[in-house]
């Protein structure tokens, strides 16, 4: 193990690497070394371990003297295996990937990039290179490099091409080795503006109206990777003024924003969503953002906060706006509580955008049942070009927005079923996700095939 890896290992267990020669590794700790540090060092190196005990003041003095810089992805650029990490991370950035998959396979490691929601392969690498790549990533993420049997999660920031880039790392034991997934976290410089989310004018007006209310619950729903986080952060940015106290509880904090009080949960330390929420309510908040409502206890705290003078924003994993009511009921939340707290529900998905440089209309238009969409849809194709490579470039969001009007509130209280509730909402002007998808196809933003890939056909069609 090289010096940067040993340095990171010592820092993980609250030590400082003083020196590493061919025979001895010299480490400083406060008071006495932990068993975890000694075990990790003995696993990582066969050299003799020498421990120097410092006072806490000495350790703090060393930390203040040490220049705090971001680690580069790879120091040993002359080594092909080390260069692999830099090439992989750089490729992900250049191709706008959201995730990097590193997977053990038979006689090789497979590397794939998720670009605009679809996985694209990079060249396979040898097992030795794959193992070395995994080990380096675990060191960067402050994971236990000696643990191969249990999943681990972490986060790290590296310097690539002169810029700080943050990643979330998750490992999973698999047949043949450990699978690693890296998620590229949103950068602080990203524009967060509700006006650029892609909502239709009426949807945007309903969203803005809900954010202007002094209290209530606003929910954003959809599967993982559907853009909920950006929608929530854009709403928080709109509300982020000097006269409003905004507090959030997240897992993890994906986009640090100046002016917000953002707390990351730490279940192993006893810092849970429920515990942080109870503490937040004693912090005189005006707006509370909950990264995700995962259980009935969190849902109940959120709803009570929304009923007592707080604007609460959160997310759920449901397929549509109306199905959100069923999901919360399954968590044990009574309908009367929902009807009094809810102000707006947003469902959303991301679809790939057609490349404007190579898109073409092909053949006959696409006919679908009139009760789904009243007119034929254009048949778009994009073969790919030097601008996009795959026919698509970027993604756009489709939204379904359900404002909780007095009529909808009464229907919720009366335990109206989901189908009837959706019928009333559509009669009042709500467009479903699929209808907004058809509108996007008409406008040439995406293809009908992409719409079906993401949403499928409506039930019964």
Swiss-Prot record:
Keyword Nucleotide-binding included in the entry's annotation: yes
NCBIfam families registered for this protein in UniProt: PRK10436.1 (NF007755)
Name of encoding gene: hofB
Cellular component, GO annotation: plasma membrane
PANTHER family assigned to the protein according to its UniProt record, in alphabetical order: PROTEIN TRANSPORT PROTEIN HOFB HOMOLOG (PTHR30258:SF1), TYPE II SECRETION SYSTEM PROTEIN GSPE-RELATED (PTHR30258)
Name assigned to this protein: Protein transport protein HofB homolog
Entry keyword set: ATP-binding, Nucleotide-binding, Transport
SUPFAM superfamilies: P-loop containing nucleoside triphosphate hydrolases
Family: Belongs to the GSP E family.
CDD domains the record matches: PulE-GspE-like
Source organism of the structure: Escherichia coli (strain K12)
């Amino acid at each position: 193990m090289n010096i940067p890896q040993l340095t990171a290992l010592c820092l993980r267990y609250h030590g400082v690497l003083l020196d590493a020669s061919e025979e001895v590794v010299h480490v400083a700790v406060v008071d006495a070394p932990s068993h975890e540090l000694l075990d990790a060092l003995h696993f990582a190196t066969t050299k003799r371990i020498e421990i120097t005990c410092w006072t806490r003041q000495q350790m703090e003095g060393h930390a203040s003297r040490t220049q705090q810089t971001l680690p580069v992805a790879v120091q040993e650029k002359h080594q092909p295996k080390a260069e692999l990490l830099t090439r992989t991370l750089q490729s992900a950035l250049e191709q706008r990937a959201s995730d990097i998959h590193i997977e053990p396979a038979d006689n090789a490691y497979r590397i794939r990039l998720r670009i605009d929601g679809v996985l694209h392969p990079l060249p396979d690498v040898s097992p030795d290179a794959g193992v070395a790549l995994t080990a380096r990533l675990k060191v960067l993420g402050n994971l236990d490099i000696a643990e191969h049997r249990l999943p681990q999660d972490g986060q790290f920031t590296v310097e690539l091409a002169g810029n700080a880039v943050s990643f979330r790392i998750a490992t999973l034991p698999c047949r043949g080795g450990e699978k690693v997934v890296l998620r590229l976290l949103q950068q602080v410089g990203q524009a967060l503006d509700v006006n650029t989310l892609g909502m239709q004018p009426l949807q945007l007006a309903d969203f803005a109206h809900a954010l202007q209310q002094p209290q209530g619950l606003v929910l954003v729903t959809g599967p993982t990777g559907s853009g909920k986080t950006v929608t929530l952060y854009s709403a928080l940015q709109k509300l982020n003024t000097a006269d409003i106290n905004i507090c959030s509880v997240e897992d993890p904090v994906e986009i640090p924003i100046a002016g917000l009080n953002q707390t990351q949960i730490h279940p192993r330390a006893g810092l849970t969503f429920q515990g942080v929420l109870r503490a937040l309510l004693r912090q005189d908040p005006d707006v509370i953002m909950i990264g995700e409502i995962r259980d009935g206890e969190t849902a109940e705290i959120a709803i009570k906060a929304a009923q007592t003078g707080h604007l609460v924003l959160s997310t759920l994993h449901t397929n549509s706006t109306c199905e959100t009511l069923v999901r919360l009921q399954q968590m044990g939340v009574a309908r009367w509580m929902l009807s009094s707290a809810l102000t707006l529900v947003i469902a959303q998905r991301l679809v790939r955008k057609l490349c404007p440089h190579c898109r073409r209309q092909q053949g006959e238009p696409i006919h679908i049942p009139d009760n789904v969409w009243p007119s034929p849809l254009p048949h778009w194709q994009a073969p790919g070009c030097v601008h996009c490579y795959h026919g698509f470039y970027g993604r756009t969001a489709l939204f379904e927005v359900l404002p909780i009007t007095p009529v909808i509130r009464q229907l919720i209280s009366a335990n109206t079923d989901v189908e009837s509730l959706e019928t009333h909402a559509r009669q009042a002007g709500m467009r479903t996700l699929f209808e907004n998808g058809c509108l996007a196809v008409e406008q040439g933003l995406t293809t009908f095939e992409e719409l079906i890939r993401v949403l499928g056909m409506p039930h019964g069609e």
